[in-house]
A protein has these predicted regions:
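Structured, non-membrane catalytic/scaffold regions adjacent to prosthetic-group chemistry
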Residues: 7-19, 23-27, 46-278
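Hydrophobic cores of alpha-helical transmembrane segments in multi-pass inner/ER membrane proteins
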Residues: 33-44
Length: 278
């Protein structure tokens, strides 16, 4: 619209050719180049859409080889801290998905998660098994942050929990540990062929500021709709990387043999990206 408002032909020639006072021939040449570019762009989108529908895994693999290294090098090293105010908190935040419905989880909900222990295992020097009360007894961190979903909606909420960095300091990962595997109570795996719901993040991401294992939301115990008893808050990523209904965590060297080997249930089944930086 700005290009049209300021003179389409002259503006286009300035953008494409770098010419401030174009001739008629230069006008035509700039328009031809722009049309060719648009045609190529449309063709690329048509090809990519068809290919992703026909061979989603091949498309995922191809993009992962190109996009993931760029995101890891350019975006992941950036340190971000959100600082929203209490008045920014969304009155009625949207919950995505449904709580687990299987018997074991429902029994834990009825007991207020008494008897549940958050287990930390794998490539660690000191395995842990912490009750919800023990997690609450650790130094708490509080933050008000904006949650962004890949579907386009968002909400702002206050979270309280224990820093994932503090848990890592307690369990002391071995030099072989590179990733954290979160296992959950989520029962999407009960659908045939879907496998266990899980999520994986790398240790570098786990140690970034405002990365919490949250047990409270907006001053109240975490609701089941939002991931009770424990959910991951990873504020530099889109919502699907923040695993809910956490059962345990395991330090691992590789996730190649977990699920389909793409670092999470959504990446395995829905072909989501391994990284989701905001």
């Amino acid at each position: 619209m700005l290009l049209i408002a300021h003179g389409f032909r002259d503006g286009l020639a300035a953008i494409v050719l770098g010419v401030q006072t174009p001739t008629a021939a230069q006008h035509a040449f700039a328009i031809a180049i722009a049309l060719c570019f648009l045609a190529a762009l449309i063709a690329l989108h048509v090809w990519a859409t068809r290919r992703s529908l026909q061979e989603p895994r091949a498309m995922q693999d191809g993009l992962q080889r190109i996009v993931d290294p760029l995101q890891a090098r350019l975006l992941q090293p950036l340190i971000s801290r959100q600082r929203y105010r209490p008045q920014d908190i969304t009155v009625a935040p949207r919950a995505n998905g449904r709580p687990p419905r299987h018997e074991k989880y429902c029994e834990l909900v009825e007991r207020g998660f008494n008897g549940w222990r958050f287990e930390v295992s794998g490539l660690v020097e000191q395995p842990l098994a912490l009750t919800l009360d023990e997690l609450r007894s650790l130094e708490a961190e509080r933050q008000i942050t904006l949650h962004k979903c890949i579907q386009g909606w968002s909400y702002t909420a206050a979270w309280q929990g224990v820093s994932l960095n503090a848990i890592l300091d307690r369990c002391r990962p071995t030099p072989l540990a590179r990733y954290i595997l979160f296992r959950t109570f989520d029962d999407k795996w009960e659908e045939p062929g879907h496998g266990e719901y899980y999520g994986v993040i790398d240790l570098g991401l786990a140690r970034t500021p405002q990365t919490l294992l949250a047990y409270d939301m907006n001053g109240q115990p975490l609701p089941t709709d939002f991931g009770a008893p424990l959910r991951l808050r990873l504020e530099s990523q889109l919502g699907y990387k923040m695993v809910k209904w956490i059962r345990s965590m395991e330090l691992i060297a590789s996730y190649d043999d977990i699920g389909a080997g793409y670092s999470g249930w959504r990446a395995d089944l829905l072909h989501y990206s391994r990284l989701a930086p905001i």
